[in-house]
């Protein structure tokens, strides 16, 4: 039976990419810097000691990172019995954002330039916001700036609740984010507002509109809820997900995968929030998956909870939890199944600012007759999509080189 499981550790980079300097990210290293902080006793909040990832290490994580950076991360060495094939991949796409990374790993790199709102204050054109407000029947909005999603709630959450004005903000990514309180503004109202924004943003070539619902009573307890929703553009070409679906296969989205691909190529969507629930849902879908199925999960917490918030200890704890559950996944796989663990970009929690970092991503592959050992440096994330196409005997993708 042929099945593929893709476990996408959102933002888990393994060292500055070859073109990192163009992005201001030379020297970034999500995995390496987390390991270093743990080894130095600087990540002992909620956990303690060196970063411990025995199962990821057996799959080749430390070796992939060593080939990327030239040295083993602190606490890791060439002393494990490898069971997986490992490599590290350079992003071909023009950006270091979520859609670019995901689309490229499915065989469709983003070779055009996204639109961005580059001004840190007064970020959005008045013509754009006027149209959104008019269509939504609103008399104003808050924000209009680059911001951390948690900080802006502390600063503007109460005013939003009093005034009913939505919070519009952006970042270094090609994104338009809208934060609204679920109780006072309403979740469905937020979703409708995002749909309007998605339509009005078409001329600006913005990759995503993101609904950022939150709850709480004040700055001390405002918190995002699990009802985030991404409104992405469609990929510019057919991904390997589309091709498997067209061939009669199944593509199961766990978490925000369906949103990122604008539902293209998806046959089933499973909602789950948090590392534990996402892992549980992935296991459940693998248990029930039949022939010619992809189960594709985005573990978003690594990015949203730990990377952007620059929470080194939280990131380390999350990785150790993820690692502790990998044996459950491995025990479910048949000999012919293919397991791939990778990332869509970096988000080094020790780096300046709060944005993504341009890094190599790990490519860890297990099963399907693959021999344990190095896959080397891959020239594109699209090698993953090409390998999946080869595995399922689909029409080859335009980009990427198969390692199967």
Swiss-Prot record:
Keyword Isomerase found: yes
InterPro entries membership: Alkaline_phosphatase_core_sf (IPR017850), DeoB (IPR010045), Metalloenzyme (IPR006124), Phosphopentomutase_DeoB_cap_sf (IPR024052)
Top-level taxon in the UniProt lineage: Bacteria
Main location, first listed in the record: cytoplasm
Top-level class of the enzyme under EC nomenclature: isomerase
Enzymatic reactions: 2-deoxy-alpha-D-ribose 1-phosphate = 2-deoxy-D-ribose 5-phosphate; alpha-D-ribose 1-phosphate = D-ribose 5-phosphate
GO biological process: 2-deoxyribose 1-phosphate catabolic process; 5-phosphoribose 1-diphosphate biosynthetic process; metabolic compound salvage; nucleotide metabolic process
Recorded GO MF terms: magnesium ion binding; manganese ion binding; phosphopentomutase activity
EC number(s) stated in the UniProt entry for this protein: 5.4.2.7
Pathway per the UniProt entry: Carbohydrate degradation; 2-deoxy-D-ribose 1-phosphate degradation; D-glyceraldehyde 3-phosphate and acetaldehyde from 2-deoxy-alpha-D-ribose 1-phosphate: step 1/2
Compartments reported by the entry: Cytoplasm
Gene: deoB
Record: residues binding Mn(2+) 1: 10, 344-345
Name of the protein: Phosphopentomutase
NCBIfam families: deoB (TIGR01696), PRK05362.1 (NF003766)
CC annotations in GO: cytosol
Details of cofactor binding: Binds 2 manganese ions.
Functional description taken from the UniProt entry: Isomerase that catalyzes the conversion of deoxy-ribose 1-phosphate (dRib-1-P) and ribose 1-phosphate (Rib-1-P) to deoxy-ribose 5-phosphate (dRib-5-P) and ribose 5-phosphate (Rib-5-P), respectively.
One family name in Pfam for this protein: Metalloenzyme
Binding positions (Mn(2+) 2): 303, 308, 356
Family to which the UniProt record says this protein belongs: Belongs to the phosphopentomutase family.
Cofactor: Mn(2+)
Disulfide bridge partners, by residue number: none
Keyword terms of this UniProt record: Cytoplasm, Isomerase, Manganese, Metal-binding
């Amino acid at each position: 039976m042929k099945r593929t499981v893709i476990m996408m550790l959102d933002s888990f980079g393994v060292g500055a990419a070859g073109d990192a300097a163009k992005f201001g990210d030379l020297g970034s290293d999500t995995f390496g810097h987390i390991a270093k902080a743990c080894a130095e006793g600087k990540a002992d909040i909620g956990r303690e000691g060196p970063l411990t990832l025995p199962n990821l290490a057996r799959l080749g994580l430390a070796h992939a990172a060593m080939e990327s950076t030239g040295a083993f991360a602190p606490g890791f060495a060439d002393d494990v019995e490898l069971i997986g094939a490992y490599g590290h991949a350079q992003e071909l796409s023009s950006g270091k954002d979520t859609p670019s990374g995901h689309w490229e790993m499915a065989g469709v790199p983003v070779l055009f330039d996204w639109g961005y709102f580059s001004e840190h204050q007064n970020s959005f054109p008045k013509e754009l916001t006027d149209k959104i407000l008019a269509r939504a029947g609103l008399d104003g909005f808050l924000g209009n700036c680059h911001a951390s999603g948690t900080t802006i709630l502390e600063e503007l959450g109460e005013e939003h609740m009093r005034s009913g004005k939505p919070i519009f903000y952006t970042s270094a990514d090609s994104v338009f984010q809208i934060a609204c309180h679920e109780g006072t503004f309403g979740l469905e109202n937020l979703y409708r507002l995002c749909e309007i924004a998605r339509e009005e943003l078409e001329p600006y070539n913005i990759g995503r509109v993101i609904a950022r619902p939150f709850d709480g009573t004040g700055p001390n307890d405002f918190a995002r809820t699990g009802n985030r929703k991404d409104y992405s553009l469609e990929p510019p070409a057919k991904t390997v997900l589309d091709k498997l679906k067209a061939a009669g296969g199944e593509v199961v989205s766990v978490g925000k995968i369906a949103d990122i691909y604008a539902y293209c190529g998806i046959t089933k969507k499973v909602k789950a929030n948090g590392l534990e629930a996402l892992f549980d849902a992935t296991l459940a879908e693998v248990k029930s998956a039949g022939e010619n199925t992809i189960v594709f999960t985005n573990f978003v917490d690594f990015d949203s909870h730990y990377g952007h918030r620059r929470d080194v200890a939280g990131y380390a704890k999350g990785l150790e939890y993820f690692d502790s559950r990998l044996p459950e996944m491995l025990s479910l796989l048949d000999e012919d199944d293919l397991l791939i663990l990778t990332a869509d970009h970096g988000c080094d929690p020790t780096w300046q600012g709060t944005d993504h970092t341009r890094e190599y991503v790990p490519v860890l592959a297990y099963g399907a007759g693959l021999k344990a050992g190095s896959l080397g440096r891959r020239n594109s994330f699209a090698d993953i999509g090409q390998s999946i196409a080869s595995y399922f005997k689909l029409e080859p993708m335009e980009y990427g080189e198969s390692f199967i």
